[in-house]
Amino acid sequence: MELSLTLFVTLDGVYQAPGGPEEDPSGGFTQGGWLAPFVDDEFGAFIGAIFGRAEAFLLGRHTYDIFASYWPKITDSDDVVPVKLNALPKFVVSSHLDHADWAGTEILRGDLLTEITAIKQRPGGEVQV
């Protein structure tokens, strides 16, 4: 498998998923949802194409917590994002997460380089970060 990264970032270095203002206010961040005004059909097609290539996901614990609280509840079979997120393997890097209730989740607790190398040696396509 190969690692693939898609990042939403402003010119001044702010990066955050295209969620709403309340998505992640940690550290006093008040600009959540900055991408929302720019989301249109073309953006949706772009995201659909990216998720269409996914064969697994690599998440940090914080992102996992956000995703796991939302995506398992979304069951639109016509939307590639929840279809892929809910069906494919998810690898979560964490030394604190005790268990993962989201189906298909494996917690990576060992040496990160060793764990990622092992994932990359598996057969398959993209592991999206």
Cite the ranges covered by each PLM segment:
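Portal/gating segments that form or line small-molecule/metal binding sites
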Residues: M1-Q128
